[in-house]
Amino acid sequence: MESIQALAQLLSSMHVVDLSPTLYTNMPGWHSHPNVMIVEDARNFAQNGYFLQTLLLPEHSGCHVDAPAHVLPDKADQTIDIFPANSLFGVAKKIDLSQEHYLPGDLAPLSKVEEVMAQTGIAIEKGDIVLFDFGYDQYLVDVEKKPASQRNWWGENEPGLAEDVCRFLFEKGVRAVGSDTPACDMAQVNGQITAGFGHRKYFLPNGIFIIEGLYGLAQVPASFYFMAMPLKIKGGSGSPLRPIAIF
């Protein structure tokens, strides 16, 4: 009991930052996935005596996690519902690449990642959750009422991670890799994938989760405690998340 009270007191004294975007109809997402749809008055006070919305959304909506089954036919049994609820709890290390102004199709090399690590005084260790801040969540700000071409740009354009970065993270034995882009390690230009070494080679085949669509990484320090839980979707290829940073 004393340990629980101590934990509660500790948590109440710390900062908590939400790292997810708000879900809404036709929000930006991966260009070939179905759109998010929210039926706002599925039930209403006038007809039903209460208010309720109906959500129609792909598993990979907003901030979300990819399970190995998402892209690997030989791991079709590794769906999101089989993993423990605390699979995405752990120490997070942020790699801030936002000042590099990477363009869609660019690949961040290991030399730059190591430079940022040295500048911020962090080291990647086994079990870490490594999150890349490309500054691409700026393209999710106030886009809800913009034309579809502008709203969808984020889901079709992104920088990615060079192969040496993906190999480095695999060799370090990290728990998960994430970013504020739609596909983390993958680079694409106008919906055409130009590179992607993590999904099918270094990350998912080796049990390293991929977190995509993070929002607000600029608000958190270089190291913090990360918590996120996926929905327990039977046979799910992934799940939406509401991740938080605690520091």
PLM-predicted stretches and their roles:
Residues 1-247:
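Active-/binding-site microenvironments in catalytic and ligand-binding cores
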